[in-house]
C-alpha cells in the first residue's frame, strides 16, 4: 500500500517540482546531503583517531548502508556502532535504518557486536551545536518569533512510541522521560525547549510545529 501510494501517486506529481527545487540546492561540490555527510565522516574519523574506522552510508542513496557495512566487514571489526543522523527517534526513519542494518548483517558468517544510538535529541553537544547556528542567523536580523518546524508523522505512529496509555498527544509531551523517550512528538518538544533555553528564548517567543505534504493523516 505504501509502495503504491508513493510510486503511483506522490512521486509522479512531486518529482518535477522537487527536481527544480533540489537543483537550486546543488553547489559546486554537488549534493549538500552527500558532501556534508562525507565531511562529517572525515571530522569524526579525525576526532576518534586510528582506533576507530568511520564509514558513511545512506538509506536510499549512494554510498549505501550496505557498502558502509561491507567496508567495516573488510576491517574485521569486533563492534559496530550505528548512528542514524536523526536526532529524534521514529520508526519510519531511525527504525528503518536499524531494520536495514540487521537485514544485511544477518547473512554474514561472523556477526560482530552491534550497538544502535537510537536518539540524541537532548544531547548537550547536539543542542549546543544547533544553538550556535541559530545564534549566527538571529544575529543578522531581529526576529519577533522563532518557529521550530519538524517533519510530521501520522498520529497512529506517534501513539505507538510511548508506553501504552501514556501518550495523549498533549500535555504528556511537556516532559521527556523513560516512558516517552521514543515518542517522536515528545522528543521534538524536548529538543525545542533545550534549544530555546540555549538561545535565551522565552516560552512566548517560539512555537513548535509539524509539517507534511500529505496534510492530515491519522
Enumerate the language-model features and the residues they cover.
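Active-site-proximal alpha-helix that buttresses catalytic centers in soluble enzyme cores
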Residues: 1-218
